[in-house]
Amino acid sequence: MKKLIALLLTLVMVLSFAACAKTEAPAEDTTEATEANTTETTTEVVGDPVAPAMSHEEYMAAEMDSEIVIETYVQATQSWWDNKITVYCQSPDGAYFLYELACSEEDAAKMVPGTKIRVTGFKGEWAGEVEVMDGTFEFVEGDTCIAEATDVTELLGTEELIAHQNEFVSFTGMSVIDIEYKNGEPGDDIYVTLAKNGATYSFCVERYLTGPETEVYTTVGTLKRGDTVDVEGFLYWYEGVNTHITSVTVTGAAMSHADYIAAADNTEVTLITNVQAWQSWWDNKITLYCQTEEGACFIYEAACSEEVANSLGNGSTILVTGYKSTWEGEAEIVDATFVVIPGEFYVPEAFDATSLLGTDEMIAHQNEIALFTGMTVKAIEYKNGEPGDDIYVTLTKDGADYNFCVERYLTAPDSEVYTTVGSLQAGDTVDVLCFLYWYQEMNPHIFHIMPVA
């Protein structure tokens, strides 16, 4: 499927050049001139023939440091300085990055998008970016062409993406993770981290391409973590994909907890939240208990690599995207992906929910870390009749019964809480810390229990 997508994208790129205007003059009948000058032309000294321009395929196949000749179209330039200019170029069969091309200030002014140029230089590579170095050029009169952006969102994380290196591309539905100015304040490059499907990617606002006075520079500077954006730019490479952004459109933002709760089932949701605990990782999935200062959420079987699962800590900040769902009264996020935001943590204190037992107010705290004090043990029952699976715990308070659970994927049989609960007797008094899970009614998942003497 990915190979099919890559093939279709290549076709789209070629078609995007089909509309390029040609301004070549019509051919003249030169038969007479040829016949009349046959003798003369055969006696002339013929100079070195003009080297034919390479195709993009031939350029990519050329050895590093070898001389190359290409004809291509200017798409954008970085700032001219010291008789040099760096140019982003593209042709119907591929794109090029021309680093510090020799160029007068007068010619730099003519380097407008669509202009055709013939370039002679040397093929080089720097940090994965294939480029033309030590180049010279001449303008080629005739056709002009401006590339349309090719959407390569589906190629993120694949080996096919690099085949589009330096092309003018677009990415849709990207989530903002981080915005960082190169020197800590506006004026220099902006390093942008965006996420898609649980993976992060580096982008850059290159100040010599789109400087501090441009709209894109200003817009990127105002982005907030969790914003959803569509991006266009040149598919530059720096130790991995590092697109140079030329435009950004904000299409959404991370939800508040109130907006998440109000969202209808099957609605796509994006939240910034903090992981407080998780069930056992398996089959590249993990179930998370999360809470911020605003409220809590339960993320069911989010896509997650083992490496990411092992990196989670109590309070880790994540950006999660998935779909709102309700199962047996439990609001949860399903079919989710998430990205860990490094260096930020939040762990709330448990709130004492004892006084809310039996009230309608309890559900407003669904999935939060809660404390229940002075609860009396009524019954302990193993799910399958013996230790190893979940433990169903019935606790009473003021004559009413409430169902709790020791969820084995949260607190396994070898954990202290599992052992402690298994040793309880009817009539024991306990204080309980739990996540306020719901199953047809309040059914908290216990993660700590304290017998009261």
Could you tell me what each predicted segment is?
Residues 18-28:
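Bacterial lipoprotein signal-peptidase II cleavage site
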Residues 1-9, 21:
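Positively charged n-region of N-terminal signal peptides that target proteins for export
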Residues 26-49:
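Intrinsically disordered, low-complexity serine/threonine-rich repeat tracts
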Residues 45-453:
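OB-fold single-stranded nucleic acid-binding module
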Residues 5, 14, 45-46:
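Short hydrophobic transmembrane-like helices used for membrane targeting/insertion
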